[in-house]
């Protein structure tokens, strides 16, 4: 697991237990991931596990090897982080291209997520994506998801301090009036973008297959401010979609669910008052 960095897999991974890959960006290209799990817990299975452990220890005496086979799950996770080049954007991405992923007796989870707290005039964005093309993915339960959440407060000091780095007027206002400026010219912009794309791929689940995209944006007000006048403006862009393209085939022995959900909430109030503004 490498938080905030990139992982690229182009080789083969054969595991007797679980496989977990986690980073800010996960790429599986021309790669293969297979797992096996101990279903019956029989003497033969235990003996095979013991032999496997001994082989690993012989290769690497310092290796730490599990005493029992795992469930054979496969999990790919991308957790978005911001970068120095784009400090106001949080992005998580998973790309699976020309790959074979098989959890013989376990579940498969492919999840990309991004969360961003604190909006500003220049825009604060969370972006999560899963792109699958020319791939074969099969397991017991298969879940593929992209989820983003972004929030901000209009009139907060943070909005001014962040905006001050990019806008001379806001910087001058904040430097002169500090907290007293309240929401004199307070503008917050946020964006949440989630998407899952499956193209020319085969997805098979012995039980349930679920593909989902969810994007959520919330903008609230920071009440208070000595001046108590001005205008609050909240701008929120939300996009959530699932696309099944080309020759893709989706099969589930039980339930197959595809969903895309987006929510956008803006709650703006007058400075120093609990009364809602008539516009948002």
Where are the model-predicted features located?
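Low-complexity, glycine- and small/polar-enriched segments
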Residues: 1-280
């Amino acid at each position: 697991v490498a938080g905030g960095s990139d992982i690229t897999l182009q080789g083969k991974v054969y595991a007797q237990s679980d496989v977990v890959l986690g980073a800010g960006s996960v790429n599986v290209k021309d790669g293969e991931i297979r797992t096996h799990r101990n279903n019956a817990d029989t003497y033969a299975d235990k003996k095979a596990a013991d032999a496997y452990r001994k082989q690993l220890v012989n290769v690497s005496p310092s290796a730490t090897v599990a005493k029992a086979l795992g469930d054979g799950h496969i999990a790919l996770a991308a957790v978005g982080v911001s970068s120095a080049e784009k400090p106001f954007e949080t992005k998580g991405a998973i790309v699976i291209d020309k790959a074979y992923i098989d959890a013989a007796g376990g579940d498969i989870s492919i999840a990309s997520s991004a969360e961003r707290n604190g909006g500003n005039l220049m825009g604060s964005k969370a972006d999560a994506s899963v792109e699958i093309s020319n791939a074969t993915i099969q397991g017991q339960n298969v879940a593929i998801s992209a989820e983003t959440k972004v929030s901000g407060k209009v009139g907060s000091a943070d909005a001014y301090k962040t905006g001050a780095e990019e806008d001379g007027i806001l910087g001058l206002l904040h430097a002169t009036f500090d907290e007293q400026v309240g929401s004199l010219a307070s503008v917050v912009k946020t964006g949440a973008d989630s998407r899952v794309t499956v193209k020319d791929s085969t997805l098979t689940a012995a039980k349930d297959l679920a593909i989902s995209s969810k994007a959520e944006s919330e903008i609230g007000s920071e009440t208070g401010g000595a001046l108590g006048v001005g205008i609050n403006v909240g701008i929120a862009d939300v996009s959530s979609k699932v696309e099944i393209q080309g020759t893709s085939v989706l099969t589930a022995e039980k339930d197959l669910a595809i969903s895309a959900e987006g929510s956008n909430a803006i709650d703006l109030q007058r400075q120093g008052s609990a009364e809602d503004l008539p516009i948002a």
